[in-house]
Amino acid sequence: MKLCGLDFETANSCNGSICSVGVAVVENGEVLERKEYLIKPHKSLDWMSKFCRDIHGITYEDLRESPEFSKVWQSVKTMLTSADCVAIHNAPFDLRHLHNILSLYHLPSVSFDYVCSLQLCRHHFPEAHSHSLNCMADMFGMTFQHHDALEDAETCAKIASQLEIPENFICRFEYLQNA
């Protein structure tokens, strides 16, 4: 199964305040394609909280010359929709941000199948003391830089590619553009 890992880092607590996106396509454990973009947040959400900055290390200055999400969306969308399924660790968080940013920019409708790798890990490893991405990566012997969008996306896809994904764990994300 071809999986596409997706991860966002955010500038603040507002839904849609994406400041970094990582996307990695993995098939049979091999990375086929990977991309990361620093994103200048939408003008209505254009501020960086200390809390978020301390988590991912991205500063407002890092984003000053970065494109807005609408400029990179086509590339991200192509990768997402080329995969059989998108793997997202704690999918509700990232999908809430994706839905809001698509709406803010009035971007065209999109849909894709996805699996929440957090739920998948809870299913396969109920005894684990934590199901966070870094703990699961340790369990699989993977090293990565946590809270780096590209590293998180790639690690998520690699973990999901090594696990059986029950049919009922696959969900559908649908964003319908408002007319």
Protein language model annotation of sequence segments:
Residues 114-131:
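Short alpha-helix plus adjacent loop in nuclease-associated cores
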Residues 1-100, 111, 138-147:
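Conserved non-catalytic scaffold segment of RNase H-like nuclease domains
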Residues 8-10, 117, 156:
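Ser/Thr-centric signal marking residues that sit
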